[in-house]
C-alpha cells in the first residue's frame, strides 16, 4: 500500500472520526437538561476527537486519489474499530462509572455493532445521559450496518450480497464507492429515521414514558437491544409494549431498500413480491408458534400470555434485537437453546439484523434441493433460481464459504470459552449473543456479561466485529495476497 493510498484512507477515517465526534452533542444536551456531571465527560470526548479527526481530514484533503476496492475493505474495518474506541472513551474516563478499559470497550463495541450485550450489572442506576447515549450508539450503528449491507458489501461481492443489487432502485445502483456512500446514506437515513419515529410514537401510545420511549424506539429499530432498565422490556410488564417491541423487531429486519421503495412509490407490492421477505416471515411464524406452544405446554403462562411473551422474545432473538422479558432466564433450557439457534438465522440482507441472513439460508436450501433433483436426473440441465434470478456459481461459492467461515469462527469461540472453564451452555449462548449481534446471554451471562474474564471479553469484542462485518472484510486484511500490488 503506497503513501498516496495511506493518505486517502487517513483522509476518509479522519472525516469519519470528525463526523462521529458530533454524536457527543445530543448526550451533552440530555446531561444539561437533567443537570448531570456527565456533561463534562461528553464535552471532553467531543473536543478530543473533533480535533483529531478534523486534523487528519484537513491535512490529507489534497490527496486526489480515487478510492479502490482494497481501500474500501480497510476503511470498513477502521470505521468500526475507531467508532468502537470513541464510543468507549466517555464510559472509560468517567470515574463515577468505575469501568475498566476492557469493560468500557466491550460496552462501546456492543453498542456500535448493535449487539446490546452489557457488562453493567445495574443499568437502571446509570445517569440518564448514559442511558440515552447507549441507545444512540445502537441507532448510529444501525445506520452504519444498513449502509454497509446495501451500499458496500454488494459492491465488494461479499457472501452473496450482490445477488439483489440489480433489484435496487436509484441511488443504490451506482458502482462507485464514494457516490454510493453519500447518496445511499442520505436516502437510508430518512427511511431509517421515519421507522424510528414511528416506533417511538407506538411505544408512547402503549404507555411507555417519553424518555424510555425515545431510548427504546431508537434501539429497537436498530435491533440493538440496549434498554434503560436492567429488566429490559420486562420492566414495564405491559403486553402492548411487548407487542410493539416484537412488531418493530420484525419490521426492522426487512431489507431497507424495500422500505425505501414502499415509501417512495407508496405501494406495498414490493413487500409482497420479495421472496426473501416471504421466507423470513415464514420462518418467524414457525419460531413464534413453536415457542408459544413450548411455554404454554409447561404452564408458565396462560394461552394469551404465552403467545404475547413468545411473540416478543422469539421476534427479538430471531432478528438479533436482544430486548427481553424479565424472566426469560427461567424459561425451559430447550426453548432458550431453540431461540439461540434461531438467532443464527437473522433477518433479511440489507437490514440492521445480525446472523447469517435469510437470503443465504434460502440460497442454501435451493442449492440442496437442486442437488437432489440433479442426482435424480443426472443428465438434466438444471439451475438454482431465487426470485426468478439464476444464482451464479460465483454467488453460490461466496455463500457456502461465508457459511463455512461463520460456523468455523462460532465453533472456535465456543471451544475457547469452554476451555476457559465456562460451561457449554454459557459458552454457546455467549458466542451466539456476540457473533450474531443479538446480545442476550444465558447461563452465567444471563444477567450481565461482566462475569467474563478480560481475555473472554476481548475475544467477544472480536466476535461482535466479525459478525457485524460479515467475516470477510476483517480476515481479508490478514491475507498476504490482499497486500500485493
Residue ranges and their predicted role:
Residues 1-485:
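Membrane-proximal intracellular helices of multi-pass ion channels
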Amino acid at each position: 500500500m503506497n503513501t498516496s493510498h495511506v493518505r486517502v484512507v487517513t483522509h476518509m477515517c479522519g472525516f469519519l472520526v470528525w463526523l462521529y465526534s458530533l454524536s457527543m452533542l445530543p448526550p451533552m444536551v440530555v446531561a444539561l437538561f437533567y443537570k448531570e456531571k456527565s456533561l463534562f465527560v461528553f464535552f471532553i470526548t467531543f473536543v478530543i476527537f473533533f480535533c483529531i479527526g478534523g486534523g487528519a481530514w484537513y491535512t490529507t484533503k489534497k490527496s486526489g486519489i480515487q478510492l479502490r476496492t482494497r481501500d474500501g475493505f480497510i476503511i470498513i474495518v477502521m470505521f468500526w474499530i475507531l467508532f468502537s474506541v470513541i464510543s468507549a472513551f466517555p464510559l472509560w474516563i468517567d470515574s463515577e462509572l468505575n469501568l475498566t478499559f476492557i469493560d468500557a470497550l466491550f460496552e462501546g463495541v456492543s453498542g456500535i455493532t448493535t449487539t446490546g450485550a452489557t457488562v453493567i450489572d445495574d443499568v437502571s442506576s446509570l445517569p440518564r445521559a448514559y442511558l440515552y447515549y447507549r441507545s444512540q450508539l445502537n441507532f448510529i450503528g444501525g445506520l452504519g450496518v444498513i449502509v454497509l449491507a446495501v451500499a458496500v458489501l454488494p459492491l465488494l461481492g461479499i457472501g452473496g450480497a450482490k445477488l439483489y443489487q440489480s433489484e435496487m432502485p436509484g441511488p443504490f445502483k451506482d458502482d462507485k464507492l464514494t457516490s454510493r456512500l453519500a447518496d445511499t446514506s442520505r436516502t437510508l437515513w430518512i427511511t431509517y429515521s421515519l421507522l424510528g419515529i414511528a416506533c417511538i410514537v407506538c411505544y408512547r401510545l402503549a404507555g411507555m414514558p417519553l424518555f424510555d420511549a425515545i431510548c427504546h424506539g431508537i434501539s429497537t429499530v436498530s435491533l440493538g437491544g440496549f434498554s434503560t432498565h436492567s429488566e429490559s422490556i420486562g420492566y414495564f410488564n405491559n403486553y402492548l409494549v411487548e407487542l410493539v417491541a416484537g412488531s418493530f423487531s420484525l419490521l426492522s429486519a426487512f431489507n431497507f431498500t424495500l422500505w425505501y421503495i414502499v415509501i417512495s412509490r407508496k405501494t406495498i407490492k414490493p413487500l409482497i413480491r420479495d421472496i426473501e421477505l416471504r421466507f423470513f416471515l415464514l420462518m418467524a411464524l414457525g419460531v413464534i408458534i413453536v415457542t408459544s406452544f413450548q411455554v404454554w405446554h409447561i404452564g408458565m403462562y396462560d394461552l394469551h400470555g404465552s403467545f404475547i411473551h413468545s411473540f416478543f422474545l422469539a421476534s427479538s432473538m430471531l432478528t438479533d434485537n436482544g430486548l427481553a422479558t424479565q424472566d426469560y432466564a427461567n424459561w425451559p433450557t430447550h426453548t432458550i437453546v431453540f431461540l439461540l439457534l434461531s438467532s443464527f438465522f437473522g433477518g433479511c440482507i440489507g437490514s440492521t439484523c445480525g446472523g447469517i441472513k435469510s437470503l443465504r439460508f434460502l440460497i442454501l436450501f435451493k442449492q440442496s434441493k437442486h442437488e437432489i433433483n440433479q442426482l435424480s436426473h443426472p443428465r438434466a440441465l438444471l439451475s438454482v433460481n431465487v426470485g426468478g434470478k439464476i444464482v451464479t456459481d460465483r454467488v453460490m461459492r461466496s455463500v457456502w464459504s461465508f457459511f463455512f467461515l461463520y460456523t468455523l469462527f462460532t465453533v472456535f469461540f465456543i471451544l475457547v470459552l469452554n476451555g476457559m472453564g465456562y460451561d457449554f451452555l454459557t459458552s454457546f449462548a455467549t458466542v451466539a449473543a456476540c457473533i450474531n449481534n443479538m446480545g442476550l446471554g444465558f447461563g452465567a451471562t444471563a444477567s450481565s456479561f461482566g462475569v467474563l474474564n478480560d481475555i473472554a471479553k476481548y475475544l467477544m469484542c472480536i466476535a461482535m466485529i466479525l459478525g457485524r462485518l460479515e467475516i470477510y472484510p476483517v480476515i481479508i486484511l490478514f491475507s498476504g495476497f490482499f497486500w500485493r500490488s
